Amino acid sequence: MTLLVTGSSGFLGRRAAAYLASLGHTVLTPSHSQLDITRESSVRVWFAEHRPDAVIHCAAISDTGICQREPERSHVVNVEGPVLLAKACRETGAKLVFCSSDQVYFGSPYPGPHCEEEPLSPGNVYGRQKLLAEQQCAALCPDTVSLRLSWMYDDQSLPGEHGHFLTTLLSALRDPAQPLSWPVHDFRGMTHVGEVVRNLPAALSLPGGVYNFGAENDRDTFHTVRALLERLHLQEPLSRLTPNQEAFAQNPRDIRMDASTLHAAGITFRTTLQGLTETLGNLL
C-alpha cells in the first residue's frame, strides 16, 4: 500500500512511518512545504499527484496549554486540517485513519472507563477540537477510523523530543534527591507507543467508526506508580513516593478508556501496569 503519514516528525508519526515502511509499504512523509494540510489547494494538488491508498493522520497541535491559549490557531490545525484530508480521501477513495485523543473524555460527568458511545462535552479546547474533527471527518467520509489515543511513552527518546511519563519517572528513580509525587485525582491509561504503531495495520482494516485505542487502567496515577514500584521491588523509590492530593482536586480527571469495542475487533493492548512493568523492568 501507499500510505501518507502526516506529522512524521512527531512522537507517534515518526515511529509509525518507520514501522510501516519496515513492513514493505510505500510510506510518504511530505514536509509542510510539500503538503500544507490547512490549505485546500495544497491538499488537492498533493493528493492528485500521489493518490495514497490510506492516510494516517498524526499531525496536530497536541499541547493542551497551547490549545487553551491559542484556540483559533489550533482549530485550524486540529479541525480544519483533518476536514480537508477527509474531503481528499472521499474524492480519491483513500482510507482515513484519524488520530484522536482520550482528552475528549475530560470533564465527562460519567466515571471511567469510558466507552465510545458516551455523550461527550469535553472540558478543554483540545478535547473539543478532537471531538469536532472526529464528527466532521465521519460526516464527510463515513469510512473514517478515529482512534482515541491515550498518553503514550517509549523506552527511548529520539532527538528533539520532549519528555514523557516514563522519562520523568526514570529521572526521579535515578536521583534519590528528587521527590516522587503523583496525583490521586488523575485517572488515565498509558500506552507504549510501540504497541500503538504495531496495531496500526490492523486499524486500517477496521470499519469506519470511533475506537478507544490504547491501554486500559483501573488505578489513579499515584496508585499506578506505587503498583509499578512494588512489582519491580524498588524499595528505595517506594519510600519516597507520596500522593499529590492537590492536583485535580477541584476537578478530578478520569479519562480512562474501555477498550471492549477494540477487543471485539481482535486488537489488544497490554494494560497500563503490564506495559509499564515490562518496559521499565527492561530499562533498569
Could you say what each language-model-derived stretch is?
Residues 235, 250-284:
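C-terminal amphipathic/interface module of NAD(P)-dependent oxidoreductases
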Residues 197-199, 203-246, 280, 284:
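Mid/C-terminal beta-alpha module of Rossmann-like enzyme folds, strongest
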Residues 83-121:
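Conserved Rossmann-fold NAD(P)-dependent oxidoreductase catalytic core, especially the SDR/UDP-sugar
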